[in-house]
């Protein structure tokens, strides 16, 4: 197959390796009288999840991406682009940069390409690739961008080392992750807290870490990056922000928790009545007297120049 050009970078179109990556549906298999969980993307692969990702991206553009922009001519690697929920924002904010967005899922890439075309953007190319077998030479990219990816990986430190090797000296690595342990809300609800914990536990069962946001600084330093800075980005919602009550509390966070209902019950983490009560109480925080807080973490590090 022919190679393709992204900006001034030539990308080798090689077959995918067979390494396991994170973008696969969560599944439980019956083994005797127990359920075992396979390594997977805990939120699943289906149209409703794709819609949730789009809602999340739309609600969080200013909070997460207002300070992300790349110089003209830069070649930027976006790892784990999924359905392009963040890609459109990146491309719009840096119209003269060249983006190569990769994902393991052909279906997600097809949807991402459609979104880019619909937005009239021409500075993005897509490539199907495994995160631990990226077909690029070292020091190929001016910048690397990763959003909501590390939480799904069993080896996030190894992934960051790979991304750092792909950076040119003085290039930046930007990582954004959430932390479900940062969630607080009113009215308080033990059932809602238990429902959130089901998601945290399921993600741990499949090798991920829903609490990874708090670990970004040590992870980036361990990867060898310099001048690492991590900033908390808190989503605060009350009745004065009905837009966020709908877009974030209902369509993003609670939809994400509700999406693991069947898996949590099958895994024996909860029962249907308890889980459903928790989801109802999360929706309750979007009412006129409710309050909801959640913190994302954005880390940026620079690859040092050789001594």
What does each of the following model-derived ranges do?
Residues 38-58:
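Class I SAM-dependent methyltransferase Rossmann-like catalytic core
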Residues 132-143:
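A short acidic, Gly/Pro-enriched loop at the edge of an enzyme's catalytic core
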Residues 142-156:
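A short SAM/SAH-binding and catalytic strip from SAM-dependent methyltransferases
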């Amino acid at each position: 197959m022919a190679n393709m050009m992204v900006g001034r970078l030539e990308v080798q179109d090689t077959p995918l390796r067979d390494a396991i990556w994170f973008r696969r549906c969560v599944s439980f298999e019956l083994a005797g009288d127990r359920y075992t969980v396979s390594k997977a993307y805990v939120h699943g692969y289906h149209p409703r999840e794709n819609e949730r990702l789009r809602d999340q991206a739309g609600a969080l553009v200013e909070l997460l991406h207002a300070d992300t922009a790349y110089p003209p001519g830069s070649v930027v690697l976006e790892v784990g682009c999924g359905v392009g929920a963040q890609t459109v924002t990146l491309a719009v904010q840096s119209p003269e940069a060249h983006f190569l967005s990769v994902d393991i899922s052909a279906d997600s890439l097809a949807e991402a390409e459609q979104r880019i075309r619909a937005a009239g953007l021409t500075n993005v190319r897509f490539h199907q690739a495994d995160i631990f077998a990226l077909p690029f030479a070292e020091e190929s990219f001016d910048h690397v961008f990763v959003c909501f990816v590390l939480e799904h990986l069993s080896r996030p430190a190894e992934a960051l080392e790979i991304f750092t090797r792909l950076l040119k000296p003085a290039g930046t690595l930007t990582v954004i992750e959430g932390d479900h342990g940062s969630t607080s809300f009113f009215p308080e609800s033990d059932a809602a807290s238990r429902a959130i914990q089901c998601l945290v536990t399921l993600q741990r069962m499949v090798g991920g870490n829903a609490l990874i946001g708090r670990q970004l600084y040590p992870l980036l330093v361990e990867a060898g990056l310099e001048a690492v800075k991590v900033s908390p980005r808190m989503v605060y919602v009350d009745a004065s922000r009905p837009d966020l009550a709908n877009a974030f509390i209902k369509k993003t966070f609670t939809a994400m928790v509700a999406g693991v209902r069947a898996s949590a019950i099958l895994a024996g983490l909860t029962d249907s009545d308890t889980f459903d009560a928790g989801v109802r109480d999360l929706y309750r925080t979007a009412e006129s007297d409710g309050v909801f807080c959640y913190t994302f973490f954005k880390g940026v590090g620079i690859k040092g120049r050789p001594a």
